[in-house]
Structure formats: structure tokens, C-alpha cells
């Protein structure tokens, strides 16, 4: 319908959450319209984020050739960062492991909640962990910046930051993405919802979701975003 109304494929942004959903979405679009899927801006939030950051990320100090860390590599970098700052922390039997800390940090970033609040929630109010874990998170972020690497959460967080801090980029997105279509919206978190809101200042958004299929609450997914 949008194509029939004269909207160019390259001005339609198609977003979804998982790689599987993205493949299915783009295949359906190509089958229904006869237009090659590559003519649209389409894919997961993370895929679109990395495309935009490689092209427009300079104001945030991001080089086009930055490397994306998979989950294992990101956890290893965090572990090495912790070891450099406080080797005894990881040796203590009762302290949370690097993988656990990575989950706390990721959850805070995706939900846009203060890391301190997440730490207290996960440790039943133990404030002893607040200062060191926040220090580890800051050092981890600096290590990524210095090495020009990004974890999956960076692809969203930096995209949002760029929309907020770079008016030229925000205007480009609003002009380029005249129509925004989001599938599997029940799996989006607050960070992704903020991205959609900042892109679609024209309010031309169609979102599809099913609350019974919301399975990523452990990563901050909120079906309420659709309202």
C-alpha cells in the first residue's frame, strides 16, 4: 500500500527483533511487492544500528571499521577489565562472576534503568557491590571506546545517543525513514522504543505485536511499549 502511495522503498524502515524474524519479514515483503528486499532499509534493530553507526558515528568517536563483539568476546573483555582493576574480585567465591555482571550491565542499558538500581535488585539490597560494579562498567565502556569495538547493546545505545546529540543525524533519519514499520514489537525494550520515538518524529509508525509471544522480558522486553 505504501508503495502504491508513491513512497520509495528506500524511505521505508522495516525493523524487527531477531535475525529469524528479520529474514522472514524481508522475504514476505519481497514476495508481496515484487521489490527486492535490499531496496528497503530492513533488518533487526542491531543490524540497522551498526549500518548507521558506521556511516554517521564520527561525532561519537566511532570509526567506520569498528568491530562488533559477540557475547562471548564481550564477556571476556569485561572479565579482563575487572581483572585489571581488581583481580581479587573475581577470585572471591561469593562474588558474582563476569557473566553475571555482564547480564546486569546489559539489562540496565536496555531498560534505561540506573545500574545501581539493578545491582541492588539482584543482590537483595547489598550496597557493597554498587561502587565496584559501576566502576567495572565504566572501565569496560572506556576499553571498548579505546579499542574501537562495540557489543550488541552499543549498537542500540550509541544509535540512540547519536539521535539525541547530533541534530543533523536526527533530521537525516526523520527525512530518510518516512515510514517506520516494526514487527515483533512485543520483544522490544525501552531503549529500542526510544529509538523508534526519536526516528519517527513524523508519527508515521506501524507496530505489530502479540503479548502472548513476549519471551524476552529477561532482556527488558516490554509489551507495553506498543501503547
Which residues are covered by each model-predicted region?
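Post-Walker A helix-loop "phosphate-sensing" segment adjacent to the P-loop in P-loop NTPases
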Residues: 1-10
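Conserved P-loop NTPase-based nucleic-acid remodeling module centered on helicase motor cores
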Residues: 9-103, 224-227
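Alpha-helix C-capping/helix-to-loop hinge sites
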Residues: 32, 36, 59, 81-88, ...
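Hydrophobic residues on the short alpha-helix immediately C-terminal to a glycine-rich phosphate/catalytic loop
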Residues: 1-2, 25, 29, 81, ...
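Coupling/switch/interface segments within P-loop NTPase motor domains and analogous charged loops
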Residues: 72-144
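Conserved helicase NTPase motor core
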Residues: 13-15, 21-24, 41, 67-74, ...
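A short secondary-structure junction motif
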Residues: 2, 52-59, 108, 112, ...
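Short alpha-helix boundary/capping elements
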Residues: 22, 49, 108-113, 181
Amino acid at each position: 500500500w505504501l508503495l502504491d502511495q508513491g513512497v520509495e522503498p528506500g524511505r521505508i524502515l522495516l525493523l524487527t527483533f531477531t535475525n529469524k524474524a528479520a529474514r522472514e519479514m524481508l522475504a514476505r515483503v519481497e514476495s508481496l511487492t515484487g521489490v527486492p528486499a535490499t531496496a528497503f532499509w530492513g533488518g533487526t534493530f542491531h543490524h540497522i544500528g551498526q549500518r548507521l553507526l558506521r556511516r554517521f558515528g564520527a561525532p561519537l568517536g566511532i570509526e567506520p571499521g569498528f568491530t562488533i563483539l559477540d557475547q562471548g568476546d564481550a564477556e571476556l573483555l569485561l572479565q579482563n577489565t575487572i581483572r585489571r582493576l581488581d583481580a581479587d574480585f573475581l577470585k572471591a567465591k561469593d562474588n558474582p562472576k563476569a557473566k553475571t555482571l555482564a547480564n546486569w550491565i546489559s539489562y540496565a542499558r536496555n531498560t534505561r534503568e540506573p545500574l545501581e538500581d539493578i545491582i541492588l535488585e539482584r543482590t537483595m539490597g547489598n550496597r557493597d557491590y554498587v561502587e565496584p560494579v559501576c566502576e567495572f562498567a565504566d572501565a569496560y565502556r572506556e576499553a571498548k571506546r579505546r579499542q574501537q569495538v562495540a557489543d550488541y547493546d552499543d549498537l542500540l545505545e550509541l544509535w540512540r545517543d547519536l539521535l539525541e546529540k547530533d541534530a543533523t543525524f536526527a533530521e537525516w533519519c526523520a527525512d530518510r525513514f518516512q515510514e517506520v514499520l516494526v514487527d515483533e514489537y512485543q520483544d522490544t525494550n525501552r531503549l529500542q522504543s526510544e529509538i523508534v520515538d526519536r526516528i519517527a518524529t513524523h508519527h508515521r509508525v506501524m507496530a505489530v505485536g502479540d503479548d502472548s509471544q513476549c519471551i524476552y522480558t529477561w532482556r527488558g522486553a516490554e509489551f507495553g511499549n506498543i501503547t
